[in-house]
Amino acid sequence: MQSYGNPDVTYEWWAGNSVVTSRSGRFIASHIGHTGLIAFAAGGSTLWELARYNPEIPMGHQSSLFLGHLAAFGVGFDEAGAWTGVGVAAVAIVHLVLSMVYGGGALLHAVYFEADVADSEVPRARKFKLEWNNPDNQTFILGHHLFFFGMACIAFVEWARIHGIYDPAIGSVRQVNYNLDLTMIWNRQFDFIGIDSLEDVMGGHAFLAFAELTGATIHMVAGSTQWENKRLGEWSKYKGAELLSAEAVLSWSLAGIGWMAIVAAFWAATNTTVYPIEWFGEPLKLQFSVAPYWIDTADSTGITAFFGHTTRAALVNVHYYFGFFFLQGHFWHALRALGFDFKKVSEAIGNTEGATVRVEGAGFNGRAPR
């Protein structure tokens, strides 16, 4: 993390990232633990929603955020094609079991395995040590992240092709084959909010899988090749030298997740193909006040969830505001990575009485006017 040249810098307890910055083993433990928390939240919340589900009320008008996603994936339908919640409890329990597995893995990496994998006796493990200013190390790790993203896209595409997902156009679950039309994919990046074909949605994910797995291969191979053997010239400032750091990587990560959250908010607000009305409620209307926000267009009578708002309203507004604050975190850490010291801002504000103004070349140097 940014230390501004202080070799003995200390961080407060709430700066959790600083604890694992230079200890890759503990960094992995925090990742696995975080995954376990997500799995536990998903499983527990799904059971909570299922226990309170009322078939007399539209799903989008009650607490059904997790149930709605499962229904859109084609989970919970009986043989007649009606959503009854069959199999949903099993999905939730699997998530709870996995959360315990992830928790155990996190504990192992936290208390048993090496604090830094650079000290591991396993050669393969040592390749995942953290060297924040080493482009070979960072691109190698990035390649593995892209690999898992690509595999997730493939899993989604194959699930839709083999099992099927819910199609609001026909009101039932059907198998969906991807449409790998590159012209369509190129054009859809500009109007994806209005997409109304599940084949096009799957085609976009299939293309993403190809792009991410290609990028994963390139990054993993490049990361396994020493910089001087890549014949790419000198590792200069123009190519990112002295910019690559833990603080910079954190800022880019926050930018990515913030942008995805905002895009998801705009998409979920009005798209009824990927977010069917049956499961998430009616489309929303964008309003402006101190900040943008979305309001329900449906009659709130009978809505029992989220303080009288639909599932869609809760999903969209939470995503948007989380995305907004993630982007603020991105700007904060990006400026710190570039060397900007925010403490000097407060010092300057607190010292306005004795501040001096210097105008270069004008021959003036005096106290600031009061």
From Swiss-Prot:
It is a multi-pass membrane protein. GO terms for biological process: photosynthetic electron transport chain. One of its GO terms (molecular function) is chlorophyll binding. GO terms for cellular component: photosystem I; photosystem II; plasma membrane-derived thylakoid membrane. Keywords: Chlorophyll, Chromophore, Membrane, Photosynthesis, Photosystem I, Photosystem II, Thylakoid, Transmembrane, Transmembrane helix. It is found in: Cellular thylakoid membrane. The antenna complex functions as a light receptor, it captures and delivers excitation energy to photosystems II and I. The Prochlorales pcb genes are not related to higher plant LHCs. This low-light-adapted strain contains 7 pcb genes. The antenna complex consists of divinyl chlorophylls (a and b) and divinyl chlorophyll a/b binding proteins and binds more divinyl chlorophyll b than does the antenna complex from high-light-adapted Prochlorococcus. This is Divinyl chlorophyll a/b light-harvesting protein PcbD. The gene is pcbD.
